[in-house]
């Protein structure tokens, strides 16, 4: 025949995939044709080494054929299992029998247990805060970079950039304009500013953490005029939520009017809307910690705990969707969170967690109502205690105790990289993070 056939010189891998790994999950692989590399951006779980040591490449799309090894052995991806604990090289042969391309295939596996909470002690403050008088809070600058502020009094603070969370560099800050008798524990971060209520009912704010000015309450909207509105405490913030009509971040406070306490909200710290209902006696009034939880309906809820005026056997969180109407999250069962001094709540890694008290036990909850001791891997840092047996032949007893036990007063905040920062009254600082929240892609 006079027909001439021209065979393709295409020696590229068009698609690549592995057999499912754990729990039937199919991991996506990236093909870099320039570098001739194939890899997974989202690393496989810890322990996958025992699966990928003998696994099938179930997707390998080429126009020609593939060989492997020094001998260029013909490779059949549907029957030839491979060991991908180390990178391997596959050679693609084009149909023209001349053109070839080699691809390096790398399977990335997490080396850390994703469910472990890992703690690290950081650079201490240059001086210890006064007893029961310190507050840690995060403030973003104009470039949206986070700074960790620790207020040790109403005239002094320390600041460190969190640009490199592995390293703290403390700068002493002179604080001006903050009233001398302000409760530092009630400072709230809102719209890249810090706000606090003064005992005389005024609100003070700062955009740099050092210079504070009177925010100036201008108006209160509700059923009747408030002659002399006094802000008792600033509680928390609401996140913008289209489902509930919250158009922008909103500040929540409690104001005093005629001897009664009412909730109030503001989008600027000056103009406020007051609730109709008074505040329950069981609602937290001091050292409030807040977190944001998106419920099953997709609605954002602000959830708070703190010191209450009444004593109780349990720590009961309260939640709101609009800042004006609140409900407690008490449980009729025995699965309540035991009462603890100065509790801190966080919605973190898909669960609620409660820290505080003597810092021996963390309590966890799926929706904030029924509580249990946290998972074995989600603990405070522990120290090993070895007690010798009474007699020579008796085995020694090994127990573990929280390094935070009875460390005393503290303040806690969480940054955008999911680091939990705890500042202690002796000036020591610890940083913790759940491993999986540090992985690049979930």
What are these model-predicted stretches?
Residues 1-134:
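Predominantly extracytoplasmic/ectodomain segments of secreted and cell-surface proteins
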Residues 115-125, 167-179, 212-225, 273-281, ...:
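Beta-propeller fold detector
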Residues 118-124, 139-177:
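Beta-propeller domains
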Residues 128-146, 180-195, 225-250, 284-301, ...:
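Structural signature of eukaryotic scaffold interfaces centered on beta-propeller domains
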Residues 152-163, 198-211, 245-269, 301, ...:
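Structural motif
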Residues 274, 282-292, 320, 328-330, ...:
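N-terminal export/ancillary region detector
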Residues 335-386:
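Loop/turn-rich, solvent-exposed surfaces of beta-rich toroidal or solenoidal domains
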Residues 385-442:
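Blade-level signature of beta-propeller repeat domains, shared across WD40, Kelch, NHL, RCC1
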């Amino acid at each position: 025949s006079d027909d001439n056939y021209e065979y393709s010189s295409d020696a590229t891998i068009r698609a690549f995939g592995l057999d499912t790994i754990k729990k039937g999950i199919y991991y996506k692989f990236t093909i870099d044709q320039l570098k001739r590399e194939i890899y997974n951006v989202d690393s496989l779980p810890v322990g996958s080494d025992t699966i990928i040591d003998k696994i099938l490449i179930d997707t390998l799309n080429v126009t020609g054929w593939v060989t492997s090894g020094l001998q260029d052995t013909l490779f059949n991806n549907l029957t030839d299992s491979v060991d991908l604990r180390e990178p391997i090289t596959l050679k693609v042969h084009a149909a023209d029998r001349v053109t070839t391309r080699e691809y390096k295939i790398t399977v990335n596996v997490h080396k850390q247990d994703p469910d472990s909470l890992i703690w690290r002690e950081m650079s201490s403050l240059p001086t210890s805060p006064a007893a029961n008088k310190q507050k840690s809070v995060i403030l973003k600058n104009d470039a949206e970079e986070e700074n960790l502020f620790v207020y040790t009094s109403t005239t002094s603070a320390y600041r460190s950039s969190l640009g490199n969370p592995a390293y703290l560099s403390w700068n002493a800050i002179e604080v001006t304009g903050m009233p001398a008798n302000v409760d530092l524990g009630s400072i709230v971060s809102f719209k890249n500013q810090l706000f606090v209520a003064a005992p005389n009912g005024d609100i003070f704010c700062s955009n740099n953490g050092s210079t504070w000015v009177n925010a100036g309450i201008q108006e209160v909207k509700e059923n009747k005029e408030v002659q002399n509105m006094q802000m008792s405490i600033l509680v928390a913030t609401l996140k913008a939520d289209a489902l509930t009509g919250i158009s922008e971040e909103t500040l929540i406070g409690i104001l005093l009017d005629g001897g009664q306490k009412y909730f109030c909200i503001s989008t600027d710290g000056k103009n406020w809307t007051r609730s109709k209902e008074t505040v329950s006696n069981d609602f937290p009034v001091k050292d409030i910690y807040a977190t944001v939880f998106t419920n099953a309906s997709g609605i954002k809820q602000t959830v708070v705990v703190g010191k209450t005026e009444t004593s109780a056997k349990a720590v009961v969180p309260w939640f709101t969707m609009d800042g004006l109407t609140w409900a407690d999250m008490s449980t009729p069962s025995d699965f309540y969170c035991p009462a603890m001094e100065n509790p801190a709540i966080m919605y973190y890694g898909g669960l609620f967690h409660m820290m505080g008290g003597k810092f021996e036990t963390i309590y966890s909850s799926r929706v904030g109502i029924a509580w249990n001791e946290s998972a074995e891997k989600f603990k405070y840092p522990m120290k090993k205690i070895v007690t010798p047996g009474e007699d020579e032949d008796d085995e020694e007893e090994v127990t573990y105790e929280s390094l935070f036990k009875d460390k005393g007063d503290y303040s806690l905040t969480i940054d955008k990289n999911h680091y939990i920062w705890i500042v202690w009254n002796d000036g020591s600082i610890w940083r913790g993070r759940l491993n999986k929240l540090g992985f690049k892609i979930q």
